[in-house]
Amino acid sequence: MSDIALTVSVLALVAVVGLWIGNIKVRGVGFGIGGVLFGGIIVGHFVDQAGVTLSGDMLHFIQEFGLILFVYTIGIQVGPGFFASLRVSGLRLNLFAVLIVIMGGLVTAILHKIFAIPLPVVLGIFSGAVTNTPALGAGQQILRDLGTPVDLVDQMGMSYAMAYPFGICGILLTMWLMRLIFRVNVEAEAQKHESSLANGHSLIQTMNIRVENPNLNNMAIQDVPILNSDKIICSRLKRDDTLMVPSPGTIIQAGDLLHLVGQPTDLHNAQLVIGKEVDTSLSTRGTDLRVERVVVTNEKVLGKRIRDLHFKERYDVVISRLNRAGVELVASSDASLQFGDILNLVGRPASIDAVANVVGNAQQKLQQVQMLPVFIGIGLGVLLGSIPLFVPGFPVALKLGLAGGPLIMALILGRIGSIGKLYWFMPPSANLALRELGIVLFLAVVGLKSGGDFVDTLTQGEGLSWIGYGIFITAIPLITVGLLARIFAKMNYLTLCGMLAGSMTDPPALAFANNLHATSGAAALSYATVYPLVMFLRIITPQLLAVIFWGMG
């Protein structure tokens, strides 16, 4: 058997063993995809004992390409919501998550200085303690750039594996500890979260208002400032028994019922100006109007603003709301359409069908993957990661590398959505498949390279010490920030758990947090809010630590 065939066969065996290990769960918690690392260590140990030689060049390529696939698909997935998460609504969560990252780096620096831990080892412990695989890849790359021997670079994977198990357990123990210390009632916390959402600014809601302000009688909708803004959409108007789709030029009269869509605060402001909120139904049932959701799949409308498509003027159809990447938005006239946007339309059946034809509404296209944008994005990401950033006093130039470059490029492209006929939307199933494939390949190679010396290091070397260092790096930031967030910021417990899981970019911890309450989405929401920024920082941090430690000698 050739070296290439043997290498592929061994990698397949690693994946099988590792995924089987990952599926083993204790009280609903397992290693998940991280099991592949331990599968690689097990197989690598026996491969080393048998004296089998694998293709080093091929293993290196597979490791790097797997990492690129993983971080690129993450960026494409979270890109549409990344920049929004940095705004005020998620600022507090992101600040606490960033504090966890910074504290982890500081604890790592202190341990390195006090105990003189070798640089590759301490970076591996850091990456494993925070359960972040791309950090491992970024750290290994910067070490190679610094001229570190290959055998020492491989030590990073070994120390990563030592610290990884408690990295997962440490998050779960912190969640349990917070619940114990503050005597948390999970059901009550879930109800508080739902109440805060209902009273907050994040949900798009509707309100039916009767026109009672005499100053608005016989005025056109476009002449009423509150109705001629991008914050409120008037999607239906009922006069006597007639329901209609209003246009900007529609004249409103006293007694008209308006169906408005917007955020709660804006709806309240509109109600103060227009009149009184009523419980009267403005349903399209039994009328010649209907409400339908259509999806944007036509390349010709991608990037065009809603106002430029003139749906109201041409088809007498109103877009009442827009759903992008699972987030409900007011359909602002300045909003540009992206592939996969879901539009809520109100109008007559024939008119809605006409608009659906314009925007595409081809459901099968949502399951298709444009491969050209994928490789354009990966290529641009690799180029971005290769650009050197020279910092005075540093021995080597900083680079985003193969972990950071594709991630940043994917975030940007995911936010842009489309350029001409190229769109960076990827079906969730395809994104997940590529992401899982990438991380399996990466972890399999890391495990194989670490497996030969793993047992000896654990039983006869410094393996137990490495585990101890990892416990400090995991526990100190999580417990400290958890206490601060709960005591001073009065953070909801479920939101706190999601933030802690997101700060470690740890899906098993998110699964545990989600299981705390069957119906609440609080943990998943906070996890998604902090995940993009934290992932970026986790990739950059080991590079900064490596350069700083290297410069300190």
UniProtKB/Swiss-Prot annotation:
Protein family membership: Belongs to the AAE transporter (TC 2.A.81) family. YidE subfamily.
GO cellular component: plasma membrane
Residue pairs linked by disulfide bridges in the UniProt entry: none
Gene name of the encoded protein: yidE
Protein name: Putative transport protein YidE
Source organism phylogeny: Bacteria, Pseudomonadati, Pseudomonadota, Gammaproteobacteria, Enterobacterales
PANTHER family: K(+)_H(+) ANTIPORTER SUBUNIT KHTT (PTHR30445), TRANSPORT PROTEIN YIDE-RELATED (PTHR30445:SF3)
Topology term for the membrane: Multi-pass membrane protein
GO molecular function, one term: monoatomic cation transmembrane transporter activity
HAMAP family in the cross-refs: YidE
Keyword Repressor: no
Pfam families, alphabetized: Asp-Al_Ex (PF06826), TrkA_C (PF02080)
Ranges annotated as spanning the membrane: 4-24, 28-48, 65-85, 95-115, 158-178, 371-391, 393-413, 437-457, 464-484, 493-513, 533-553
Subcellular location: Cell membrane
InterPro entries on file: AAE_transporter (IPR050144), RCK_C (IPR006037), RCK_C_sf (IPR036721), Transpt_YidE_put (IPR023018), YidE_YbjL (IPR006512)
GO biological process terms, semicolon-separated: potassium ion transport
Keyword set, alphabetical order: Cell membrane, Membrane, Repeat, Transmembrane, Transmembrane helix, Transport
Limits of the RCK C-terminal domain: 192-276, 279-361
